[in-house]
Amino acid sequence: MNTTPDLPTPRALRELTPLEARILGVLVEKQHTVPDTYPLSLNALTAGCNQKTARSPVMSVSEDEVTAALDGLKHLSLVMEGSSSRVPRFEHNMNRVLGIPSQAIALLTILLLRGPQTAAELRLNSARLHGFADISSVEAFLDELAARAQPLVVRLPRAPGARENRWMHLMCGDVNLADFAGSDAGGGADSVPPSEFEALKAEQKRLVDEVARLNALVQRMATELGIDVDAPGDAG
């Protein structure tokens, strides 16, 4: 599936920090979505890191924090700083350092910005970066990224009730797949994911409150009508 055989040999990299990973994702995204302002200034890059939409998790970082993270990325040659402008501007160098084609960069970028995604979600969310013909082509590039000597992505265990597996990037280090195994690791179909359990607890509380409200309403109406609702009914 690799359509660019002349790519350089990938380099071994250390684990990135979450902010370093976010910066790389923002640089690739803005390269495609706002090319007129790319390479990005520090201000624009910080705004992209703190963006509320299309980000998971949402961050709130300062320009000083972004500057420190940029220094680390420049040391890895993943980011380059331009010198043709009075305002420092930054661009990514992921294709050459990682040795992967633009299609794979697009998928990796979405994972860096949005967290775990299914192949279908990746195809949809990467449309502005690269148009994949079908889900199979997305999966082919993901499989290549996962099969590298230093894997860049991993297929997560299917979540309970989910129809598809999700994928996650490994730029920030390996993940414990057991944390994502859900009912498969819990040993039974009765296991409930934490989010669903919290939703069930909230629904139970709502129902309890509703029953209490209705009981109070019945008691008030009975008092107004002179009816003793606690009295036993006729035995026959």
Swiss-Prot record:
Organism for this UniProt entry: Burkholderia vietnamiensis (strain G4 / LMG 22486) (Burkholderia cepacia (strain R1808))
Cysteine pairings via disulfide bonds: none
Xref: HAMAP family: UPF0502
Similarity field: Belongs to the UPF0502 family.
Coiled coil feature spans: none
Matches recorded under InterPro entries: DUF480, WH-like_DNA-bd_sf, WH_DNA-bd_sf
Protein name, as recorded: UPF0502 protein Bcep1808_3727
Pfam families: DUF480
PANTHER family (UniProt xref): UPF0502 PROTEIN YCEH (PTHR38768:SF1)
